[in-house]
Amino acid sequence: MRIMGLDVGSKTVGVAISDPLGFTAQGLEIIKIDEEKAEFGFTRLEELVKQYQVEQFVIGLPKNMNNTNGPRVDASITYGNHIEHLFGLPVHYQDERLTTVEAERMLIEQADISRGKRKKVIDKLAAQLILQNYLNRNF
């Protein structure tokens, strides 16, 4: 069963996919979006859902450190509601506190990637971490 993980931001959506058995997550790509123009990347997402035969989604919830909802939680839930309606597939939510920080640390320490290059992959890696945390917790 393939699960797609999403890190939803205001300008990009990081995308990750699980292996068929649901053990590991792999970052796929970053989809550019524009909330002001109501462009949410659903066409590309549909292509990926078909290509990988996705059966469910996991979306990161950007909570505050004190477990209250951060300013982007509502946007993430709204995105999830759209996906559930468009694809008719279940959507789960995963606390994503510190995943972007962890992703950036990994890119600096392990890959020694420059700031400019980090910006190009950070959301994809964050989506991978969100999905991997979900897989570890549920399977």
Swiss-Prot record:
Question: Keyword annotations for this protein?
Answer: Cytoplasm, Hydrolase, Nuclease, Ribosome biogenesis
EC class of the enzyme, as a word? hydrolase
Its chief place of residence is cytoplasm
A family per Pfam: RuvX
Q: Which GO terms describe its biological process?
A: rRNA 5'-end processing
What molecular functions are annotated in GO for this chain?
Answer: nuclease activity
Q: Does the keyword Cytoplasm apply?
A: yes
**Position of the signal peptide:** none
What's in the GO CC field?
cytosol
User: Subcellular localization, per the record?
Assistant: Cytoplasm
Cystine links in this protein are: none
InterPro entries assigned: RNaseH-like_sf, YqgF, YqgF/RNaseH-like_dom, YqgF/RNaseH-like_dom_sf
Q: What is its EC number?
A: 3.1.-.-
Which family does the similarity line name? Belongs to the YqgF nuclease family.
The record's annotation in NCBIfam families points to: RNAse_H_YqgF (TIGR00250)
What role does this protein play?
Could be a nuclease involved in processing of the 5'-end of pre-16S rRNA.
* Protein name as annotated: Putative pre-16S rRNA nuclease
Give the classification, highest ranks.
Answer: Bacteria, Bacillati, Bacillota, Bacilli, Lactobacillales
